[in-house]
Regions:
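Acidic, low-complexity intrinsically disordered tails
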Residues: 1-5, 440, 576, 580-663, ...
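ASCE RecA-like P-loop NTPase motor cores
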Residues: 1-593, 600, 649
Length: 680
């Protein structure tokens, strides 16, 4: 049995050995929830890699977006080159979900484009988990809590072939079709097979190579893997497993039973609509469902077949869907990266999904079974996980409560770098003061990050700096993913010197070239100026030996005071450690390729609708810090906060402080939208 073996030229240093020891003891001692509080640049990923090696548990690493997931995937593959490191994120290049808007009578049809490379990696992840090996790490986004096929059915459809096995060629071909491979006589693509005499070639759906099976009569004579383009033989095997070409696999008998059950439920729902005098909805449901059933009978699938997944999975109404977690063994370890953002995401997915589907069901576009094609609820997710390690520089109250206040700290950086000092300066003439600091920083050969409160402020400040011949760009939620990647690359390579953003946390930026982080209007309390947000923002300067933070404010808020106090505490501990061990802080040198070489994995093209500028208050919800803050509150607390925010907005408008009023308006709309999506 393969075991995890960590490959690294470095050994744990600073706080890492003690953090690793405590976490390993916790895992082996059966502690369910642990929290690792690690400052930016302290090597949290390296520590978790050591924990994985020492505990030898299959591990799910959960990240809150594709960009950070791809970074983690790259790092874990380097740490564990001899083990199975897999990647599981949403495979949509863009996705417009099906929806119905009753107020305007608008039906929006589902529209999507699937990234074949990511689909291959998803299949590779599930295949690895069912392979019997325990040395498996899967790096996943929140996509892992959404429904996929039943692992039992998936496992039943695995085809095992052995040299000398007696099986007719046609019997193997039938098995391949049942595992959702399709026969081709033309182009040989992933998920297809071709037949040439007594030779069957199968292009595996989850790999870059194909399998060639040679027959001698009804006996398998030889099994090889080949290059699908050249036909060159790569390896020869005595036996091999061929995993299904799709996560949703259903046998013929099950399909016929499902069709009958769907028909019965359709009749009941149509009768209910008619009894309520809603004949239009009843007619609509009957026509749409009948069309889907005809497609299933003819082709074995239909558009939107996921809305019938409850039948195919043999689940009861209301029963949770199968997801990636079902493919793991019971003793797997969950590592939640940036937990202060990721955990609230888990809780937020169900409410938004359900509110959209309820409208479809109520107006006859879908059967009630569509409601069971959903992400996990937070309590379902929690119930499926045996042991969790939360990893964050700023753990939220949820993690601290679950860990019963016991936190493993990792404050010392292997490079000896200290937390950046924070200086508070007045808001008056803040832009002029900032420009002077920018020029000094550029002369030193470093880069600058500036965070503002609104998109408009970011764009206007960026244009103003450009007029002063300061090379600059801006980032916010309306800038496309690939454009953001290009902008970050330009910053690192010195094409631009200044990057302005509404909130730079969502990029997961590790930028050693940045020595100055400026926080404009730091005293404007809210989502983007909370203690956790300010701490995370300050951390962007923690990878540079000359890193520093400027907060422009006319008063020191509670959030600012907490951030400054905690930063000072950490600096004292770091300085004492460096002095005791004779360490001189060293500049971090990070490859510029780490993120960008993964660009084919993280490409996200917004749908035509999503690409339009968001209505006021919607874009702010895309920020994980905002989403995390909102979802961590209960309804009563949110309602109080909404009342207070509305009063502040009205006061700002009366005082003609329109920029502040606009910011508060956006926050209010964000809260109203979030609360509307919560389940009652």
């Amino acid at each position: 049995m393969s075991a995890f073996k960590l490959h690294s030229e470095f050994q744990p240093t600073g706080d890492q050995p003690e953090a690793i020891r405590q976490l390993v003891e916790g895992v082996e001692g059966g502690i369910r929830h642990q929290t690792l509080l690690g400052v930016t640049g302290s090597g949290k990923t390296f520590s978790m890699a050591n924990v994985i090696e020492r505990t030898q548990r299959p591990t799910l690493v959960l990240s809150h977006n594709k960009t950070l997931a791809s970074q983690l995937y790259s790092e874990f593959k380097e740490f564990f080159p001899d083990n199975l490191v897999e990647y599981f994120v949403s495979y949509y290049d863009y996705y417009q979900p099906e929806a119905y808007i009753p107020s305007s009578g608008t039906y929006i049809e589902k529209d999507l484009a699937i990234n074949e490379e990511i689909e291959k990696l998803r299949l590779s992840a599930t295949s690895a988990l069912l392979s019997g090996r325990r040395d498996v790490i899967v790096v996943a986004s929140i996509s892992c809590i959404y429904g996929i096929g039943n692992p039992v059915e998936f496992h039943k459809s695995v085809i095992e072939v052995q040299q000398g096995q007696v099986i007719s060629r046609n019997a193997l071909l039938h098995r391949l079709v049942e595992s959702l491979y399709h026969r081709t006589r033309g182009e040989f693509n992933r998920g297809s097979f071709r037949v040439t005499g007594d030779v069957v070639d199968v292009f595996l759906a989850y790999a870059d190579h194909a399998v060639r099976i040679h027959f001698w009569g009804d006996e398998i004579e030889r099994i090889e893997t080949i290059d699908p383009e050249t036909g060159q033989v790569l390896h020869e095997f005595d036996s091999l497993r061929i995993y299904p070409a799709n996560l949703f696999v259903t046998g013929k008998d099950t399909l016929h039973q499902c069709i009958w059950e769907i028909q019965q439920d359709m009749v009941k729902q149509v009768e209910w609509f008619n009894s309520q005098g809603r004949f239009i909805e009843g007619k609509r449901l009957e026509e749409r469902t009948t069309h889907d059933l005809e497609m299933m009978r003819e082709l074995g699938f239909c558009n939107g077949i996921e809305n019938y997944s409850r039948y195919f999975d043999r689940r009861e109404p209301g029963q949770r869907p199968f997801c990636l977690l079902d493919y793991f063994s019971d003793d797997f370890l969950l590592v939640v990266d940036e937990s202060h953002v990721t955990v609230p995401q888990v809780g937020a997915m169900y409410g938004g999904d359900r509110s959209r589907k309820v409208s479809l069901v109520e107006h006859g576009f879908r059967l009630p079974s569509a409601l069971d094609n959903r992400p996990l609820m937070s309590d379902e997710f929690d119930g499926m996980v045996h042991q969790i390690v939360y990893v964050s520089a700023t753990p939220a109250d949820y993690e601290l409560e679950k860990s019963e206040g016991v936190v493993v700290e990792q404050l010392i950086r292997p490079t000896g770098l200290l937390d950046p000092p924070i200086e508070v300066r007045p808001c008056k003439n803040q832009v002029d003061n900032l420009i002077g600091e920018i020029r000094k920083t550029i002369e030193a050969g470093d880069r600058i990050l500036v965070t503002t409160l609104t998109k408009r402020m970011a764009e206007e400040l960026s244009r103003y700096l450009e007029r002063l011949r300061i090379s600059c760009s801006y980032i916010h939620s309306e800038v496309k993913t690939l454009d953001r990647i290009e902008i970050i690359r330009n910053l690192r390579e010195g094409v631009i010197d200044v990057l302005v953003g509404v909130n730079l946390l969502r990029e997961g930026l590790d930028l050693p070239e940045v020595s100055l982080v400026a926080v404009m209007d730091a005293d404007k309390e809210g989502f983007l100026r909370s203690n956790r947000s300010l701490t995370q923002t300050a951390g962007r300067a923690a990878r540079n030996v000359d890193g520093r933070v400027l907060m422009y404010a006319d008063k020191v808020t509670d959030s600012m005071a907490q951030t400054i106090e905690e930063t000072s505490r950490r600096r004292e501990k770091q300085e004492a450690y460096n002095k005791e061990h004779g360490i001189i802080p060293k500049q971090v040198k990070r490859s510029k390729k780490t993120v960008f070489e993964q660009s084919e994995l993280i490409e996200e093209r917004p749908s035509p609708i999503a690409a339009e500028p968001a209505a006021s208050g919607v874009g702010i919800l895309e920020d994980p810090v905002v989403a995390g803050y909102v979802q961590s509150q209960d309804r009563k607390a949110m309602e109080k906060l909404m009342v207070r925010t509305r009063k502040e907005m009205e006061r700002a408008a009366k005082e003609l402080a329109f920029m502040d009023a606009a910011r508060l308006r956006d926050e209010l709309f964000a809260m109203e939208k979030a609360v509307a999506d919560w389940p009652n």
